[in-house]
Every structure is written in structure tokens, then in C-alpha cells.
Design a protein with these regions (language model features):
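Conserved beta-loop-beta/alpha segment of the NTase-like Rossmann-fold superfamily
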Residues: 61, 69-161, 199
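Structural signal for terminal/edge beta-strands and the immediately following C-terminal loop/tail
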Residues: 351-379
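A structural motif detector for beta-strand N-caps
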Residues: 259, 265, 271-278, 284, ...
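Extended, small-residue-rich solenoid/repeat segments and analogous flexible loops
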Residues: 216-301
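N-terminal glycine-rich phosphate-binding loop and ensuing alpha1 helix
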Residues: 1-62
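Short internal beta-strands
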Residues: 50-54, 143-144, 337
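Catalytic-core segments of class I nucleotidyltransferases/pyrophosphorylases
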Residues: 112-114, 121, 127-134, 147-150, ...
Length: 379
């Protein structure tokens, strides 16, 4: 079995994180989401992986290279062009269109392929899913999970018969129109014949175009409703909840890194905490090279990225700070994700640092205006 990771989208619903990162590169426990996918594929015997890329493609390619460090081979298919000014312009072909481009270029898909979205954490038993796919004689299989009816408008919904054969596929139907609450997880098993149905050179989507085509033609298209961990990072709220879940131990197979120095408090290498008047209530992770000044307060679940600096009197409450964030004296950050010059609350409302009370935070690498010890001053 080969694999295809879909990684060409812009991830607009996860801004500001995706202003500088493609969605598959958003970190969980300091590691990109896509890295967990690659490791999962390798554990299930998949050694050849193609990735379609477009928006900020170089971030993915530079991090993963050709995949040797993961014990796999990774190839890339760029979707876009360079304009007359020499600028790279992303131009995604849609989830199915990207697969077609790869097939026409080099014929990569010559056996069963598992297709996955690059922005979800999963622990699906791929070997079991493949066995069932082949047992049914399926041309295409979509892995589904039941979701609350009120959330069907956020997913592609699969309508199937008692044998699991897909009769209809609804792309994000309104609650009143949904005929099922079995949601597509963005994990698919395809035989090469499926790719023959995708038109050449067109933007073509799996959920809204390919799946309805398979169902309408009565082809052997099945769903498998399985119980497994599926964490879809579709929005900033999802991301916030994932990190909260990791820190509270609510997500299986994921442990907090670092060394536990107090009950529920983990720290990375070479981090300095002045405990004089400082209050830290776990679960809290403080990354490597951080500084926590005397009199600071940190209430978990909180994740503080490496190289960050929490000043005296500052309060960080149930928040996520990306690397090199300086929380200024006497400032409170409550239930926020802070990424460089932006913060986002749980509801997804974004604010620039210029809108924050008392300045809020700054770049911990910028020492301008920061009082330095006398021995650091050059005379």
C-alpha cells in the first residue's frame, strides 16, 4: 500500500497560525501534525508517500526532505506557477485534481493507496481497514465516524446501506438536510481505477465531486465506520482544544515532553524559573530556554514554547504561547493562543498585539527596551 497526504490548502480557518505555516506544519508537542501522520504510516508498513503541496510549500519540503529520517520515501507535487515577477503563486488543483496530476506525471498509484488529510491526528488501524477494503472488493472506501447531528454541517456525510455500500455523499449538509451522521474523516482507500474517473487538468474535489460521481454510477464504493482517535484541526478552536487535551492526558499515545519538576509541571532543557513568589498550577509545559521571572503566575492547561519569557507579575492562564513570546510585566493572557504579533481566543477572534492592553507581549528575541543586568552592558 502506498500513501498520499493532502497538504496544498491555505488553512484560512486556522489563521493567524497559517500566516507563516502551512496547516500540516502546525505543531503539536513541538512536532508538526504531518510528522505524526508520516510516523503512523511507517508503523503500518507504508514506505512510499506522495504529498501535494502549494501554499508555503517550501516549509514542508525543507522539514521532511525525502523522508529518510522517518524510514520512508517522500515525494512532492507542487501545484502552482512562477509569475513574470519571479513570485511563486500557489494554485491548488483540489484534493482529487492533485492526485490526477501525480498519476499523469509518473504513474505513482499502481496499487491500493491510502489518502489522508495532512491536518489531522489519527491512530486508525490501517492494516485492518485495508483488509476490509479488499474483502468487499471495493474500488473506493471512505473511513467514517459518527458525529453529533448538530455538527453534520461541518463534514462530508456518508449515506450507506446495511452492507456499508455508499448510496449518497452529502458535502457539509445543513442539519435539516443531513441524511446521516456518519462523517468522512478525510481518510480514503483508492484503487488505481478510481483515478481514471478524475478529469485531467481541472480543479476537482474528492468530497464534492468524486464521491458523488462514484455513488451515482453505482461503483463499488464503501464506507467503514470505525472507532479510533481522530483529531481534526479544522479551526483555531480545534487546535486550542487539542493542546488542552494533550496536557490533561485526554489524548491517547501522546505524552508531555520534558522533565517533571513539580506536580503537573514539565520543563525543557536549560529553562530558568525564579520560584520566589511564582505560582505555577499544572498541567503546564515550559519549553527549553525559557525564563520565568519571580512573581509570575501560570495556570494550566498551558503550553509555553521554547525561548519564551514570562515577566514578573504576568499571568498566563490556560493559554498557548508559541516560541519566543515575551509576556510583559503585569499583563494577563487568559485562554489565548499567542503567535508572534497575534492572539486568538477560544472563539477564534483574532487581535493584533497593538490592540492588546498594556502592549501584552513582544518578541523575546528583541532586547530593545529591555533592561539588562549591569554586567551585560558594554562600557
Amino acid at each position: 500500500m502506498k500513501a498520499m497526504i493532502l497538504a496544498a490548502g491555505k488553512g484560512t480557518r486556522v489563521r493567524p497560525l497559517t500566516y507563516e505555516l502551512p496547516k500540516p506544519m502546525i505543531p503539536i508537542l513541538g512536532k508538526p501534525v504531518m510528522a505524526y501522520l508520516v510516523e503512523h504510516l511507517q508503523r503500518h508498513g507504508v514506505s512510499e508517500i506522495m504529498v501535494n503541496v502549494s501554499y508555503l510549500h517550501e516549509k514542508i519540503e525543507e522539514y521532511f526532505g525525502e523522508g529518510h529520517q522517518y524510514g520512508v520515501q517522500i515525494g512532492y507535487s507542487f501545484e502552482g506557477y512562477t509569475n513574470n515577477q519571479g513570485e511563486v503563486v500557489p494554485e491548488p488543483l483540489g484534493s482529487a485534481g492533485g492526485i490526477k496530476k501525480i498519476q499523469e506525471f509518473g504513474g505513482f498509484f499502481d496499487e491500493t493507496v491510502v489518502v489522508l488529510c495532512g491536518d489531522a491526528l489519527i491512530d486508525l488501524d490501517l492494516k485492518s481497514a485495508l483488509y476490509e477494503h479488499r474483502r468487499k472488493g471495493a474500488m473506493a472506501t471512505v473511513i467514517t465516524r459518527e458525529v453529533p447531528w448538530e455538527k453534520t454541517s461541518s463534514y462530508g456525510v456518508v449515506v450507506s446501506d446495511a452492507d456499508g455500500r455508499v448510496r449518497e455523499f452529502q458535502e457539509k449538509p445543513a442539519r435539516a438536510d443531513a441524511k446521516s451522521n456518519c462523517a468522512s474523516t478525510g481518510i480514503y482507500l483508492f484503487e488505481p481505477e478510481v483515478i481514471d474517473l478524475i478529469p485531467s487538468g481541472e480543479v476537482f474535489d474528492i468530497g464534492s465531486q468524486l464521491f458523488p460521481l462514484l455513488a451515482q454510477r453505482g461503483l463499488p464504493f464503501y464506507c467503514q465506520t470505525r472507532k479510533f482517535n481522530w483529531i481534526d484541526i479544522g479551526s483555531v478552536k480545534d487546535y486550542w482544544e487539542v493542546l488542552q487535551g494533550v496536557l490533561t492526558g485526554g489524548i491517547g499515545n501522546m505524552t508531555v515532553p520534558g522533565v517533571q519538576v513539580e506536580e503537573g509541571v514539565w520543563v525543557g532543557l536549560n529553562t530558568r524559573i525564579d520560584w520566589n513568589g511564582t505560582r505555577i498550577v499544572g498541567p503546564v509545559y515550559i519549553g527549553s530556554g525559557c525564563q520565568i521571572e519571580a512573581g509570575a503566575t501560570i495556570i494550566g492547561p498551558t503550553w509555553i514554547g521554547h525561548g519564551s519569557h514570562v515577566c514578573s507579575g504576568a499571568r498566563v492562564v490556560r493559554s498557548v504561547l508559541f516560541e519566543y513570546t515575551r509576556v510583559l510585566p503585569d499583563v494577563t493572557l487568559d485562554e489565548l493562543i499567542v503567535f508572534k504579533d497575534y492572539s486568538v481566543d477560544r472563539a477564534g477572534e483574532m487581535r493584533h498585539v497593538s490592540q492588546a492592553e498594556c502592549g501584552g507581549w513582544s518578541n523575546a528575541r528583541d532586547r530593545r527596551g529591555v533592561r539588562r543586568p549591569a554586567e551585560d552592558v558594554v562600557k
